[in-house]
């Protein structure tokens, strides 16, 4: 099924997934399209950050669901 991923710049990416896909696999698909490594991605759906080891089914993702991609930036120390 197809879901949508929105970036902070409001760019929308269409991603084909299966309900059995983990969030980590979805991040890999985003990397294939956008070149952003999964380690730098945070995925938010209905206001919650999604855990890499859980599946699309666990989060009740449906065709047309919109996920939000947030970049995980490392903070520096003083």
UniProtKB/Swiss-Prot annotation:
GO terms for molecular function: mRNA binding. PROSITE patterns: UBIQUITIN_1 (PS00299), UBIQUITIN_2 (PS50053). There is a cross-link at residue 76 (Glycyl lysine isopeptide (Gly-Lys) (interchain with K-? in acceptor proteins)). SUPFAM superfamilies: Ubiquitin-like. Keywords: Isopeptide bond, Ubl conjugation pathway. The keyword Ribosomal protein does not apply. Detected in stems and flower buds, but not in leaves, mature flowers and seedlings. Pfam families: ubiquitin (PF00240). Residues 77-78 form a propeptide. InterPro entries: Nedd8-like, Ubiquitin-like_dom, Ubiquitin-like_domsf, Ubiquitin_CS, Ubiquitin_dom, Ubiquitin_ubiquitin-like. May function as a stable post-translational protein modifier. This is NEDD8-like protein RUB3. It comes from Arabidopsis thaliana. The lineage of its organism: Eukaryota, Viridiplantae, Streptophyta, Embryophyta, Tracheophyta.
């Amino acid at each position: 099924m197809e879901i949508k991923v929105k970036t902070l710049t409001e760019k929308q990416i269409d991603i084909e997934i299966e309900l059995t896909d983990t969030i980590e696999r979805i991040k890999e698909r985003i990397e294939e399209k956008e070149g952003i490594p999964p380690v730098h991605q945070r995925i938010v759906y209905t206001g919650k950050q999604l855990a890499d080891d859980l599946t699309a089914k666990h989060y009740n993702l449906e065709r047309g669901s919109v996920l939000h991609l947030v970049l995980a930036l490392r903070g520096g120390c003083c």
